[in-house]
């Protein structure tokens, strides 16, 4: 979901009446939908558009919801999945949640509960997309660092002070300060603690 665009929900259910009622409910509440009568049809489409949530029937005639979930994981499509389950289908529901499903809704579903769950799932999707964009931007910014700047950054993340880094690199502490300023400028941060926090969040500096 991007600003000004409705969140896109993929509805996957082999029961036409259920599929149509779900799509209608979602569209009436501002969501865009794509409907699929089978797991195979959905998987053929998956990846052609970025879905914000997948509403997935657990038990279908051919590919099951668990099968579809496993294939999405194999393709690294991290869309939040809300499983539609029959009442009492506890063991399979537990398996879906253990495999990473966002939540489940029992049939016959309560419209308001379903909408609340979908909104929470699309919020998760938006957060993941924002994080992915931050990571991509950081990776691009990191490419701008020189080899020496990367070396200095590594020492900073290891907790070393200017004098220690200066001795290790055989340069002056003042030069270390210059390198730090350049690094912060290239990585778009204003303070050293913010630089350290950002780098650690992005996976740098870990043993």
Model regions: which residues?
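Conserved acidic segment of CheY-like receiver
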Residues: 3-18, 22-26, 39, 54, ...
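Basic, Lys/Arg-enriched C-terminal extension of HTH/homeodomain DNA-binding domains
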Residues: 181-207
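The feature encodes the CheY-like receiver
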Residues: 19, 61, 85, 89
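Acidic catalytic/metal-coordinating carboxylates
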Residues: 37-38, 62-68
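C-terminal output helix
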Residues: 89-91, 105-118, 164
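Helix-turn-helix DNA-binding segment
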Residues: 136-174
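Active-site beta3 strand of CheY-like receiver
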Residues: 49-55
């Amino acid at each position: 979901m991007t600003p000004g665009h409705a969140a896109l929900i993929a509805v996957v259910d082999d029961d036409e009446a259920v599929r149509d009622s779900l799509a209608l409910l979602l569209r009436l509440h501002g969501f865009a939908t794509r409907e699929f009568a089978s797991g195979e049809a959905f998987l053929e489409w998956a990846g052609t558009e970025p879905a914000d949530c997948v509403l997935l029937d657990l038990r279908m005639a051919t590919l099951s919801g668990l099968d579809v979930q496993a294939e999405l994981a194999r393709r690294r499509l991290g869309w939040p999945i809300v499983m539609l389950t029959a009442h009492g289908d506890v063991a399979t529901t537990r398996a879906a949640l253990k495999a990473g499903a966002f939540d489940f809704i029992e049939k016959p579903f309560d419209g308001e509960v379903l909408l609340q769950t979908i909104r929470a799932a699309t919020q998760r999707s938006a957060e993941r997309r924002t994080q992915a964009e931050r990571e991509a931007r950081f990776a691009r910014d990191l490419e701008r660092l020189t080899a020496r700047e990367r070396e200095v950054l590594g020492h900073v993340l290891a907790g070393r002070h200017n004098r220690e880094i200066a001795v290790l690199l055989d340069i002056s502490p003042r030069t270390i300060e210059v390198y730090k300023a350049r690094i912060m400028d290239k990585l778009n941060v204003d303070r050293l603690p913010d630089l350290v926090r950002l780098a650690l969040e992005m996976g740098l500096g870990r043993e």
